[in-house]
Amino acid sequence: GWVSLNDSHNQMVVHWAGEKSNVIVALARDSLSLLGPKNSDVYISYDYGKSFKKISERFSFGDGNSSAVAIAQFYHSPANNQRYIFVDAFVPYLWITTDFCKSIQGFSIPFRAADLLLHSRNPNLVLGFDRSHPNKQLWKSDDFGQTWIMIQEHVKSFSWGVEPYDKPNTVYIERHEPSGTSTVIRSTDFFQSRENKEVILEDVDDFQLRDKYLFATKAVRLLGSLQPSSVQLWVSFNRKPMRVAQFVTKHPIKEYYIADASEDQVFVCVSHDDNRTNLYISEAEGLKFSLSLENVLYYSPGGAGSDTLVRYFANEPFADFHRVEGVRGVYIATLLNGSFSEENMRSVITFDKGGTWEPLQPPAETRYGEKTHCELSQGCSLHLAQRLSQLLNFQLRRMPILSKESAPGLIIATGSIGKSMAKKTNVYISSSAGARWREALSGPHYYTWGDHGGILVAIAQGTETDQLKYSTNEGETWKSFTFSEKPVFVYGLLTEPGEKSTIFTIFGSYKENGHSWLILQVNTSDVLGVPCTENDYKLWSPSDERGNECLLGHKTVFKRRTPHATCFNGEDFDRPVMVSNCSCTREDFECDFGFKLSEDLSLEVCVPDPEFAGKPYDPPVPCPVGSTYRRTRGYRKISGDTCMGGDIESRLEGEMLPCPLAEENEFILYATRYSIHRYDLASGLSQELPLAGLRGAVALDFDYEHNCLYWADVTLDIIQRLCLNGSSGQEIIISTGLETVEALAFEPLSQLLYWVNAGIPKIEVANPDGDLRLTVLNSSVLERPRALALVPREGLMFWTDWGDSRPGIYRSDMDGSLAACIVSEGVRWPNGISVDDHWIYWTEAYMDRIERVDFNGLQRSVILDSLPHPYAIAVFKNEIYWNDWSQLSIFRASKNSGSRMETLVGRLYGIMDMKIFYRGKTTGQNACIAHPCSLLCLPKSNNGRSCKCPEGVSSTVLPSGEVKCDCPHGYSMKNNTCVKEENTCLPNQYRCFNGNCINSIWQCDNNNDCGDMSDEKNCPTTVCDAETQFRCRESGTCIPLSYKCDLEDDCGDNSDESHCEAHQCRKDEFSCSSGMCIRLSWRCDDDNDCRDWSDEANCTMFRTCEASSFQCLNGHCIPQRWACDGDADCQDGSDEDPTICEKKCNGFQCPNGTCISTSKHCNGITDCADASDEQDCEIPLCTRYMDFVCKNRQQCLSHSMVCDGDIQCEDGSDEDANYAGCAQEPEFHRTCDQFSFQCANGVCISLVWKCDGMDDCGDYSDEASCENPTDAPTCSRYYQFQCGNGHCIPNQWKCDGENDCGDWSDEKECEGSPLLPITTAVPPTCLPNHFRCGSGACITNSWVCDGYRDCADGSDEDACPTSHPNVTSSPPAPRGRCSRTEFECQQLHKCIPNWKRCDGRRDCQDGTDERSCPTHSSLSCPQGYRCEDGEACLLATERCDGYLDCSDGSDERNCTDDTIVYKVQNLQWTADFSGAITLTWARPKRMSSTSCVYNVYYRMVGESIWKVLETHSNKTSSVLKVLKPDCTYQVKVQVQCLSRVYNTNDFITLRVPEGLPDAPFNLQLALKKEAEGVVLCSWSAPVNAHGLIREP
């Protein structure tokens, strides 16, 4: 259809209302730059452009005169598509409509509305800007423009905030200041109150808001200079405070232009003084920029290009830079080498978001099949017209590059091939996201597409025409359609935004009548035929076009209509997108800030940029203590890149380091197997250290001077180190020859690390780096050594040994000499040991007590007894600290009497080693300080020393008898001492043994990069899981087993494709060169389906079509039904060959034999002589609103009639679950019993746990909506009592007559309780039982008047009585009584040492010392397995399961077929795009792969019954498709070998991603009485939301 408007205005603005509305609004106006009076006309269409009605008479100034109205612009409400505002160009007047222009109201307003900004969610809220007013006023309307109030003046720019980054009514303005600069201000109440107004940045030149980013520029002036020396770019990400962005360049910066900020990364054009513009790219926060592309084309009205003709056509800056929509990471840019002319313009493209750029691949042939003779190697490529080309060719402006989300990978552009843009232009099309191009049309054209790219249309530019060209195969072939009775001079070709419709609108005029607007509409739906079926689609990925498996770390697969399938997708086609992650490769990384590619680009190595003056390896500022940062190796992952894993990632991504920590306070370090914590004694705060991969951390120590932590992992049998000052990351220093390291001790004076290698047994020593190692003691002295303590100043070493034959406390010099047992009586299971002031303290687990003795084994006494299971011990000042395995806590008490016992930390599951550190602990002298040795210097008693050589190092004996070591490799002799050579390599480099420095990326890559092979030594051997992975031959990389024999070289050496069985393709398949089979119809369709292009090789006019298709003589394929239908569908007309069609009619045959096209059947026009083609046409055609096609292809239904419980399709397909996708019935919802509370996550807990202050549900729902919220208790609910001061004590200490709490609260409310003493309240600024120093710091009360200056001002030792707290002495025993360290026998009142009490021997004549003794037994494990050392209870399933759970390894010894337990390892889960959960695991150790299978179980959290998902599978992965979206499940995998099932309680908890909600129900419509034509729609929420239903 066509409409002549009889309108001669020279501009027309058209708007589709959208949201499936048929309304189109058009404004015809004169350009404001033209001389003479101005007026305008408004037109509206209610039938989607078939007809237009002129409504200009409705726009008047209130006096009925509409001729003087000159509407400059109209605005459409994004919140309500029926609302429009029209604004006059010269008069402060506007018109509004809320019903698609059916009624229009005019209002005089107090300002000239140069710009309006309508709110995205509130349809009544509008901002208006008066640029013509001297004060640049900003106004606001709350009633859609009827009334206005002024909210700000001196406004330069304004914008709404963007949700969710801003509150709903946030407004940003850039306000002019008298200084000439601007201030950026944000307000959430339209500047009504000061508290809701915030200054974002001052002294700003320009400001811009882009979604999550804020950008501003500021000129920085030098002192004494009137000219700006440089311009700064300030950036805010996610509304954080604005910060200055950093650019690595030595050139002065003149201007910034934000080219793109759409993919969590910012492209910025930076213009320099010499008019050269470079393109930079940032990390996600937009603060650190690296160079991406030089000499990019950029125009600025006051800068680059302002002296060219472009200044007459462009008043805003721009860059020739296009983001290819629909795919990630693809951009096209224009390079400018010289002046602003097309001879100096070239196009380049990037597929990795600016990591690398390359010329566009030119097509090999023209559209007529002639060779182009354009080769990249000769500097010839394809160049595409962008903004500058359009402006330079102002008489015939070239169309911009067209790419849209509606058709991923499809690009149409105007361009030319050659060495620059200055060639004849044609239309070029790419179906591969820019990887390949073909010439589609000769000469410039208008173009667009519809039906999600299913149909392309074009019209020739610059001439009169009546022909519309269209293509249904992505521009491979074109047909023509006569759209007008006579030629039309075309101004433009448009379709509704979104490119989903098949209706196109042509704007033009008949030339002979002068300019008069003509609107013509073409509906191309008949061309596409029937709806597409699954056979009409194929899966396509942009990465396939590049020959890579992945782009930007993942493979995105789109469902795309095949080029030669002629069918329609439909407006509601929801294109499925599948995304899968990939392992990292070098292409996933770019050079980090401060680095650049080396001059030899083929190496792809990033090296430090000499122009960068910063320190790229330093920690960031700020770097909070307790957090970590990634120290660069010169590379950074491209922003938005999602790759994970692989050898390259670990080499390039940088090492994680803790933020530097300057230790000041005294603190405890304790290990809990899977973590190590730091407990500050002054503040009482506990903090987990940033460590990774801990499996069995049982021993630790700390180098206070260098701030380095050492720990041993008995599960991995390694010793590791992490320096908290940021000097290095977590590193393994010893990994060989270790077997159950149970103790570590760092010697700070000589810088030596000692450890107990209990499984061998040995006590060994090494330097801090672990490369100089020596055995000090072996099995000749040791039996089952456990703990170790050093006295460096005395040269002594003490350890505990709990072997069966000679348990005791031992002492030797630190070189292992003079070893002797100093305590052997009454010792059975000595655990921890600590030394303080010539006293040795140890925990005795069998006797359940803590004892002490002096260095000679004398003056032995029991400090505490009746302890459930003491383990590690430490001494600090006047107190002992220990942890207890049974009570899961760390305790403190007096080191002399055991009094004042208190709990410091509770709920410590798996608590192991513990040590205390403080400033001054490492000070002192010994013989090694004054007289060092050549390598290892071991202190001895009596101020002696022993020079030792590490194992494997040769030595010589000097005349003095001293041993001198030869310096090993990497050490050099200086002053008779072997000194480690300094590492002069950068952190991103590896130092070879020969001193060379190589890039760290080259280490362990199977190449001799060092020259001495040292970079390939000690490389970890990649162990691949034989059940799920394949190991590549050369690289050793593990790839999924599914990649084996898939006809793709995934390894790079083709080893994954060797020894594969030959595969025969079917008759309907094509065999690729690699052996892969693809559908025969995909041959020669211009898609790289074989991934080696063999399906597109030798494609000429000969082509094989499917059986359901007709093959034209030129080789093209068309649907069989198009042959002999009266239309020439083949370009050569061979489908209508009379010799074939005389016998056949594939269209509609009239009774007289005439064959007409199928499209002419039932089209409302009589074509047969007897009108039979329009008879029996009761079946309606599918429209945009009736777009559900029944399976029988005979009926069309509205989507509201599908899956509604009623069958409307004759074949019932509208209610078919598979065809229509109808949801299943919701399953039964589980409820808890009357004595339980049901958590929000479905878990049932005891009702008494509701509102008790503890998170028993795991999601805090049991503590929500409590009338009197309870503070979370710090004590165990079951076996501890919480004192009034917050301390925790065992329940049995309650009401025992002793002040265990310290505030007597444990003795309150006791039967017959005595009068309690009155205590003084603790100052409120410190914790209970803490002292407040004069400086305000808090210390524990026990440190006051203890002889140590713990407060910085010494106030804790002021006004103290004269005493010597550090001198330990026992008070004299009263006459007739034993001393405090003795036990008094009941008869004869004999005194014996208290350590002899309960030692199993009768020392009192009456035997009273062995009465009322605790049971001398280890832990009782009635339902599990007890370790042989008696120190831990295990579940029965943890015995012989392949993991060392006992510290003595007894749980994995003497395993038989009857006791062995098979457990899967590394059970993990991932969710894909569709919501399916993939479960993966590793085979158990020692398990046979032939007779054992896996059973997979699952249950929803809160359920007690496990459901079977999969049984008797030999795969180590499983896909869970039965789980409900947005629900939490527990999943476990059990092993079954023959008939035996190995039960396990090990499960993982996972949460299924949100899914699509069910359809809403109870849909109702009602007319709104007070508003004519308004329909109110209401509905009930779906039964199953499958997640959070969000607003669109």
Curated annotation (Swiss-Prot):
Alphabetical list of InterPro entries matching this protein: 6-blade_b-propeller_TolB-like, FN3_dom, FN3_sf, Ig-like_fold, LDL_receptor-like_sf, LDLR_class-A_CS, LDLR_classB_rpt, LDrepeatLR_classA_rpt
Disulfide bridge partners, by residue number: C985-C997, C992-C1010, C1004-C1019, C1024-C1038, C1032-C1051, C1045-C1060, C1065-C1077, C1072-C1090, C1084-C1099, C1105-C1117, C1112-C1130, C1124-C1141, C1145-C1155, C1150-C1168, C1162-C1177, C1182-C1196, C1190-C1209, C1203-C1222, C1232-C1244, C1239-C1257, C1251-C1266, C1275-C1288, C1283-C1301, C1295-C1310, C1326-C1338, C1333-C1351, C1345-C1360, C1378-C1391, C1385-C1404, C1398-C1413, C1421-C1433, C1427-C1446, C1440-C1455
Gene Ontology annotations of biological process type: endocytosis; post-Golgi vesicle-mediated transport; protein retention in Golgi apparatus; protein targeting; protein targeting to lysosome
Reported modifications of this chain: Within the Golgi apparatus, the propeptide is cleaved off by FURIN or a furin-like protease. At the cell surface, partially subjected to proteolytic shedding that releases the ectodomain in the extracellular milieu. Following shedding, may be cleaved the remaining transmembrane fragment and catalyze the release of a C-terminal fragment in the cytosol and of a soluble N-terminal beta fragment in the extracellular milieu. The C-terminal cytosolic fragment localizes to the nucleus.
Tissue: Expressed in brain, and, at lower levels, in testis and adrenal gland.
Bilayer topology: Single-pass type I membrane protein
Signal sequence annotation: none
Residue ranges of domain EGF-like in the record: 933-979
Major site of localization recorded for this protein: Golgi
Compartments reported by the entry: Golgi apparatus membrane; Golgi apparatus, trans-Golgi network membrane; Endosome membrane; Early endosome membrane
GO CC term, one of those recorded: membrane
Domain Fibronectin type-III: 1463-1555, 1559-1592
Gene3D superfamilies: 2.10.70.80, 3.30.60.270, Immunoglobulins, Low-density Lipoprotein Receptor, TolB, C-terminal domain, YVTN repeat-like/Quinoprotein amine dehydrogenase
Record family assignment: Belongs to the VPS10-related sortilin family. SORL1 subfamily.
Role this protein plays: Sorting receptor that directs numerous proteins to their correct location within the cell. Along with AP-1 complex, involved Golgi apparatus - endosome sorting. Sorting receptor for APP, regulating its intracellular trafficking and processing into amyloidogenic-beta peptides. Retains APP in the trans-Golgi network, hence preventing its transit through late endosomes where amyloid beta peptides Abeta40 and Abeta42 are generated.
The protein's name: Sortilin-related receptor
UniProt organism field: Gallus gallus (Chicken)
